Amino acid sequence: MAANDATSSEEGQVFGCHKVEEWNEYFKKGVETKKLVVVDFTASWCGPCRFIAPILADIAKKMPHVIFLKVDVDELKTVSAEWSVEAMPTFVFIKDGKEVDRVVGAKKEELQQTIVKHAAPATVTA
């Protein structure tokens, strides 16, 4: 399916992960490219999630160097449990396969600030 191909045309979007395989593919892409991955753990019945979704989509358009994923906690229960998600929305910030930060709740300013904070390229210390 062309919609699942990892191509540059995907930049600036929020990608929905509806299967564990899709999650694994995008997670691996984030690790391999050393990009920041922002995961929006959401639920269809969550009002604050619906409020923040267009804001996240707008941020994604402005930051194509960041991978934005959306995971429905009811669809991917194992992924949600693996990342200890207990409230929605929860935004998990991942670099090199590890969680570097988290924002719980539809907090627009905190979400934007945290993305900017972690989207900067990592400085090499040797």
UniProtKB/Swiss-Prot annotation:
This is Thioredoxin H-type 1. Pfam families: Thioredoxin (PF00085). PANTHER family: THIOREDOXIN (PTHR10438), THIOREDOXIN H-TYPE 1 (PTHR10438:SF444). The active site is at C46 (nucleophile), C49 (nucleophile). Disulfide bonds join C46-C49. Its main location: cytoplasm. Residues 2-120 form the Thioredoxin domain. Keywords: Cytoplasm, Disulfide bond, Electron transport, Redox-active center, Transport. GO terms for cellular component: cytoplasm. The record marks G47, P48 as: Contributes to redox potential value. One of its GO terms (molecular function) is protein-disulfide reductase activity. Belongs to the thioredoxin family. Plant H-type subfamily. Participates in various redox reactions through the reversible oxidation of the active center dithiol to a disulfide. The H form is known to activate a number of cytosolic enzymes. The record marks D40 as: Deprotonates C-terminal active site Cys. NCBIfam families: thioredoxin. The lineage of its organism: Eukaryota, Viridiplantae, Streptophyta, Embryophyta, Tracheophyta. It is found in: Cytoplasm.
